Amino acid sequence: MKDDNIENNNIEEENLNIETQVVANEEIALLKAEIKELQDKLIRTTAEIDNTRKRLEKARDEAKDYAIATFAKELLNVSDNLSRALAHKPSNADVEVTNIISGVQMTKDELDKIFHKHHIEEIKPEIGSMFDYNVHNAISHIEHPDHKPNSIITLMQSGYKIRDRLLRPATVQVVKKP
């Protein structure tokens, strides 16, 4: 009987060990699943944070670029006037006038450098290029037998843009259909 009790105790201990092992395995499986779920959440959260950071950087860059748009628009007329002054310089100018013209040229060059630094580009379509309503403003349509319809015949005023944002369209005359 003593042997039977020992054997029963051994069997009970063995069953208890098996049950304990089964419970432990179930807990391990649950913990592994929880770890996997937390790792997935971590990956998604990290990606979300990275996307938010990129979105904020882009918004900051755009705000920086376009914050100067109003100020830049006011400088466009200054640039135009400097260009007009340089286009009408006299060919037989004396030394004083030549020095003034040189100063105007240096001012125009410095303004162009500032525009370039702030990604302000001139829109200066070539004669004969096709009219694009996205960047051109047609002030008149004229007939011209030597040019294609809807092509630019005269550039009245250059346009400007900051990166992909239009500050001012180029003012042009366009050939109309016959």
Curated annotation (Swiss-Prot):
Compartments, as annotated in UniProt: Cytoplasm
CDD domains, alphabetized: GrpE (cd00446)
GO function term, MF aspect, one: unfolded protein binding
Any one cellular-component term (Gene Ontology): cytoplasm
Keywords: Chaperone, Cytoplasm, Stress response
Cystine pairings recorded for this chain: none
Biological process terms in GO annotation: protein folding; protein import into mitochondrial matrix
Chief place where the protein resides: cytoplasm
Chaperone listed as a keyword: yes
Pfam entry (one): GrpE
Family the entry assigns: Belongs to the GrpE family.
PANTHER family associated with the record: GRPE PROTEIN, GRPE PROTEIN HOMOLOG, MITOCHONDRIAL
Task of the protein: Participates actively in the response to hyperosmotic and heat shock by preventing the aggregation of stress-denatured proteins, in association with DnaK and GrpE. It is the nucleotide exchange factor for DnaK and may function as a thermosensor. Unfolded proteins bind initially to DnaJ; upon interaction with the DnaJ-bound protein, DnaK hydrolyzes its bound ATP, resulting in the formation of a stable complex. GrpE releases ADP from DnaK; ATP binding to DnaK triggers the release of the substrate protein, thus completing the reaction cycle.
Subunit relationships: Homodimer.
Protein name, as recorded: Protein GrpE
